[in-house]
Amino acid sequence: MKLNPNNTWTLVEARMNEEKDPITRRNLGLVLEHMKAEAKGDIEGVVATLTEKPRYVAHDVPGNELMNPQGDKDSIRAFYDLTIIQTGAHQLELDCDRVIADHHSVMTEGVMRMAYPGRTLAAMGMEVEDLDAYYLYQSRMSVVWPVDSKEGKLIGEETYTGTDGMDGILDRKISQDDIVPLSI
């Protein structure tokens, strides 16, 4: 089982390159820039794609304030720092099989995979066999990327997850060799 973070934006980039409408092309470009910054763990690069009052919505956990940051860019910075950087779970892939785009938003859909370090899962209270290994979060996910037409920036992300990607995570052990290096 391999995790290839470079797959995340392949379809978005292809769709952007064939798009003739300049506004829709810009919107796809924002998502592409956001995805690449996220893959590099570049929080400032992610925040640069967002409006001044961003909003993230995780529809599967609407009451969880950490997973639904909004209001300012500092709340988004804190979200990425806590959920991606501090956990070490920055190696991710959205194996995207659908991209829909218009003047108001972009929608991406596919299988989300994230490599969680064994030590992170142990700190979360799980009984981990190998602390030095990675374990694969996996779930079908759709992301709606609404765009603020006045600012020409992403409002944020609205995610819809098919299943809990943590279910069975300890059965999906991978090594660093199973993670394809970034090529950006």
Predicted regions and their residues:
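Low-complexity, intrinsically disordered terminal/linker segments enriched in charged
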Residues: 2-16, 132-139, 153-184
